[in-house]
């Protein structure tokens, strides 16, 4: 996240808060120049007890972190709950672009958001009108450079952070080399994708979009039944072959941040050939996801935020994993076999109510990868933390008891 937490820390310090930081590796150290930092160089086994003592010694009342599924973070959250420390978890926005997720206690599959559509209709009806939408720029170049700097600092300081273990399945150096290879092939793959999209448009045939997620994404490994993307591809392609109308196409879109270590085009090709539908699958490495979503007949996803993008366009969505938006009246609630033939579109009143509740209680405007985005985000975080008691999600039982009374 680059300098995000340093900027948040400085803002909190300017307001008079005592701010502390724990670094796990050299990348963490690189992006924190403020006082109050401690390098944790111990083992994973010793981490919970270290943190427990640290919290008590420094009288910590609140903890801020990005994501809640990494092993060190999961252990930290367990300790913080035991010690009564308030938890604030950041994550990429449930709605993108222009938003960042900030929830108490947990996000995604650990979110407190309920699954009853009536809850959202009732809560949204009590909220003021939607605030004006603020569009913020985001730089892929900045994201890439900050990521490279973080990983380089991590590699160069492994001798110091001897016990640090990255949660990702590949060493940073391996990923870095693969990214360079991917960039070298970019021109060729862009041209191939443009040709595929041209042929798709000329065919005039309806298609279902399947946007791939990152293979190392913990949202797949912890919040779905899949071991990785290959398993999901197998299930989707097989179901498509058995149940989709013969005139329907399947468009599979590569994730823009995929590191290229696995050739997903080849994986998809072998799978399509095995199930006899290779000629009905369009694999796209590069392309405007918003346009692909708008023109799709439906979208099938594991738990990608592309799901909320599709729902906002009134495009039917099937969620294969745990997702915050997999709610009756919003996503297709039947099985995948029936989705190909008769996808259920979202009830837009319910989806808009759901979106309104997200923005009020779970999202902060802004972004990580531009100065304007960071300034907007820091301002929103300041306001959200200051009003955290008033901005707690309304109790499910209270809201639904009013309905069922």
What are these regions (language model features)?
Residues 1-25:
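N-terminal subdomain of nucleotide-sugar transferases
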Residues 2-4, 24-120:
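Active-site and donor-binding regions of nucleotide-sugar-utilizing enzymes
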Residues 8, 15, 161-267:
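Conserved catalytic-core segment of nucleotide-activated headgroup transferases in glycan assembly
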Residues 42-58, 256, 261-306, 312:
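Donor nucleotide-activated moiety binding/catalytic core segment of transferases
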Residues 62-72, 285-331:
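A donor-sugar binding/catalytic signature common to diverse glycosyltransferases
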Residues 82-87, 248, 314-315:
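A short helix->loop->beta-strand "cap" motif at the edges of active sites that frequently abuts
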Residues 88-186:
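Catalytic core of nucleotide-activated saccharide and alditol-phosphate transferases
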Residues 114-158, 329-405:
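Leloir-type glycosyltransferase catalytic cores
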């Amino acid at each position: 996240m680059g300098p995000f937490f340093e900027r948040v820390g400085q803002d909190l310090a300017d307001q008079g808060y005592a701010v502390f930081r724990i670094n796990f590796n050299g990348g963490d150290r690189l992006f924190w120049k403020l006082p109050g930092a401690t390098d944790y160089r111990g083992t994973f086994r010793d981490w919970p007890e270290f943190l427990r003592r640290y919290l008590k010694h420094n009288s910590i009342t609140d903890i801020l972190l990005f994501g809640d599924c990494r092993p060190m973070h999961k252990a930290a959250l367990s300790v913080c709950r035991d010690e009564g420390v308030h938890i604030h978890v950041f994550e990429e926005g449930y709605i993108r672009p222009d938003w960042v997720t900030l929830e108490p206690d947990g996000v995604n599959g650990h979110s407190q958001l309920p699954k009853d559509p009536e809850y959202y209709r009732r809560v949204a009806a009590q909220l003021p009108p939607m605030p004006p939408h603020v569009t913020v720029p985001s730089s892929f170049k900045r994201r890439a450079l900050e990521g490279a700097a973080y990983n380089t600092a991590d590699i160069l300081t492994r001798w110091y952070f001897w016990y640090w273990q990255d949660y990702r399945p590949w060493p940073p150096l391996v990923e870095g080399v693969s990214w360079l290879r991917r960039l070298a092939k970019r021109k060729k793959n862009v041209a191939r994708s443009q040709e595929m999209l041209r042929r798709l448009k000329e065919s005039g045939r309806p298609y279902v979009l399947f946007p791939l997620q990152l293979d190392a994404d913990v949202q797949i490994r912890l919040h779905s039944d899949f071991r990785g993307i290959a398993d999901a591809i197998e299930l989707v392609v097989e179901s498509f072959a058995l149940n989709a109308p013969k005139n329907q196409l399947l468009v599979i879109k590569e994730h823009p941040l995929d590191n290229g270590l696995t050739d997903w085009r080849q994986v998809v090709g072998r799978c399509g050939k095995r199930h006899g539908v290779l000629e009905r699958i369009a694999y796209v490495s590069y392309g405007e996801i918003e346009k692909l979503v708008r023109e799709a007949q439906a979208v099938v996803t594991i738990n990608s935020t592309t799901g909320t993008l599709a729902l906002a366009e009134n495009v039917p969505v099937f969620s294969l994993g745990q997702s915050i938006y997999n709610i009756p009246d919003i996503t297709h609630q039947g099985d995948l076999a029936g989705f190909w033939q008769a996808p259920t579109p979202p009830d837009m009143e319910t989806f808009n109510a759901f979106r309104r509740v997200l923005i009020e209680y779970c999202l902060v405007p802004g972004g990580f990868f531009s100065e304007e985005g960071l300034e907007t985000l820091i301002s929103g975080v300041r306001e959200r933390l200051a009003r955290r008691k008033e901005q707690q999600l309304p109790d499910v039982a209270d809201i639904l008891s009013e309905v069922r009374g």
